């Protein structure tokens, strides 16, 4: 399996299938970010479009609608803890999937806590049962397993849903205490190893980044750096504009570059075809179900040639 997340933010953009789909021959599932929880009573907003689905199916791609919990004020303990609101959400999601002829639903709830984890798992159980009755696939996005997020209970998730997706990125993120790689080779290897230790490998999907971060170091001692996310081509354009050449870094399995501008030091660990290939090579050794990529539009046409070697 090879999934590409398509970030959709407006009704207008939801009507257009990803423009680079012709180059993405290896991709067999596209997941538009169509659904978002809108309150604590089981309602959600929808950007779903039947024309989009028809285009995707015509191109040989299955469509999994993504639902997130990113809106400010959403309290999963209320949404999922109440049988009434939980059932309303499940019926609504499956209803939309049927209405728009979707092939699956991708759950991207990133604000699960220890207090609502049990309700979250019950939501996944009930959703999967109803989804399977209607021949829909359920996948769930997860952080790299660690002690501080053990309550996500990936072992139980693996017994319930069809695919458990490891988001093998954000090793360093906006707000990190120090600059660093978004997804180093060792980070990916360790994350996948942790995941397959708890979830059957045939249900594990490794998600890798098409984006990187340009870090601006703080001038003050002990100050936190700031960063901006860029796609592959944009990152290389920045380096060229500063007459800077990236050099291979064996430690991260990536090309690294740094330069000074306006008295500030900038650092970047590139995500491009070579580093992506090395990560995919390591993941493939674990014989997992497939790969996913965040996000479509940050890659280059040539990137799919690398992906094609592992997604056949």
Task: Label each region the model flagged.
Residues 1-92:
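Glycan-recognition patch characteristic of GH18 chitinases/ENGases
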Residues 6-8, 34, 65-69, 109-111, ...:
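A cross-domain feature marking catalytic cores of carbohydrate-active enzymes
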Residues 9-24, 81-99, 146-154, 270-284:
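Short, acidic/polar
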Residues 58-61, 116-118, 122, 127-129, ...:
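Short acidic, glycine/proline-enriched helix-loop-strand junctions
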């Amino acid at each position: 399996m090879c999934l590409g997340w398509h970030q959709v933010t407006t009704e207008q953009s939801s009507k257009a299938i990803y423009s680079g789909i012709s180059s993405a021959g290896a991709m067999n599932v596209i997941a538009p970010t169509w659904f978002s929880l809108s309150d604590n009573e089981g309602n959600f907003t929808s950007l779903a479009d039947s024309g989009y689905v028809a285009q995707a199916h015509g191109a040989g791609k299955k469509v999994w609608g993504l639902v997130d919990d990113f809106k400010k004020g959403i309290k999963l303990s209320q949404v999922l803890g109440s049988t009434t609101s939980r059932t309303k959400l499940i019926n609504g999601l499956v209803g939309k999937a049927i209405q728009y002829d979707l092939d699956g639903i991708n759950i991207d709830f990133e604000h699960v806590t220890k207090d609502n984890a049990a309700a979250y798992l019950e939501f996944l159980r009930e959703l999967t049962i109803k989804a399977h009755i209607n021949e829909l696939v359920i996948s769930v996005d997860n952080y790299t397993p660690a002690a501080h997020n053990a309550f996500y209970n990936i072992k139980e998730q693996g017994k319930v849903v069809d695919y458990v997706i490891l988001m093998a990125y954000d090793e360093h993120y906006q707000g990190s205490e120090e600059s660093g790689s978004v997804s180093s080779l060792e980070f990916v290897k360790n994350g996948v190893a942790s995941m397959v230790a708890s979830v059957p490998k045939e249900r594990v999907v490794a998600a890798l980044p098409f984006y990187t971060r340009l870090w601006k170091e703080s001038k003050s001692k002990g100050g936190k750096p700031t960063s901006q996310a860029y796609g592959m081509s944009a990152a290389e354009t920045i380096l060229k504009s500063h007459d800077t050449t990236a050099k291979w870094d064996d430690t991260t399995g990536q090309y690294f570059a740094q330069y000074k501008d306006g008295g500030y030091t900038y650092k970047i660990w590139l995500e491009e075809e070579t580093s992506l290939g090395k990560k995919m090579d390591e993941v493939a050794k674990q014989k997992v179900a497939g790969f996913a990529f965040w996000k479509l539009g940050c890659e280059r046409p040539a990137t799919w040639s690398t992906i094609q070697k592992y997604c056949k």
